[in-house]
């Protein structure tokens, strides 16, 4: 009977501590991932595409889905962005992410949903939704998969 009491007391004492640690970990994951996205916004709005791309995993295994097309790899993703937003006759506009929902998938993974909007110099506002998978690496949190759609 005494052993049961000890186990019960330990459970009642440790459960809130463990649960609190998990919440703290979730909060730090959410904060770190949101920070990457805010840094991407800032870089984009400076027209710094290389800076924007630091939020992505620099690997041939990065995947980017958009417009029913798969782009594989960091370099190909950078080239896609350059062609779409920095080639002649194109403008990057002002980027804003909103409606972020960041769900930690443990201490080194996160699933992110959100909305994006560009405000272009001509007043147009292309926009859409995205889902991202983030992974924590030794050099920080990086997007390993991006699925972005545009409103029709």
Show the residue positions of the predicted features.
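A short hydrophobic beta-strand element
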Residues: 107-116
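Short beta-strand edge/turn micro-motifs at domain boundaries
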Residues: 127-152
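Bacterial N-terminal signal peptides that target proteins for export
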Residues: 1-7
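Short, cysteine-centered beta-strand-loop-beta hairpins and adjacent loop/turn segments enriched
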Residues: 88-91, 118-126
């Amino acid at each position: 009977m005494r052993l049961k009491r000890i186990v019960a007391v330990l459970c009642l004492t440790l459960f809130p501590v463990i649960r609190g640690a998990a919440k703290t970990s979730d909060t730090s994951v959410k904060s770190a991932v949101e920070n990457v996205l805010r840094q991407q916004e800032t870089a984009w709005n400076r027209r710094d595409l290389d800076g924007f791309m630091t939020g992505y995993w620099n690997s041939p295994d990065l995947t980017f889905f958009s417009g029913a097309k798969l782009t594989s790899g960091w370099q190909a993703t950078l080239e896609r962005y350059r062609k779409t937003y920095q080639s002649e006759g194109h403008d990057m506009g002002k980027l804003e992410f909103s409606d972020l929902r960041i769900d930690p998938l443990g201490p080194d993974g996160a699933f992110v949903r959100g909305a994006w909007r560009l405000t272009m110099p001509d007043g147009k506002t292309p926009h859409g939704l995205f889902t991202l998978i983030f992974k924590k690496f030794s050099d920080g949190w990086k997007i390993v998969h991006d699925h972005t759609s545009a409103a029709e």
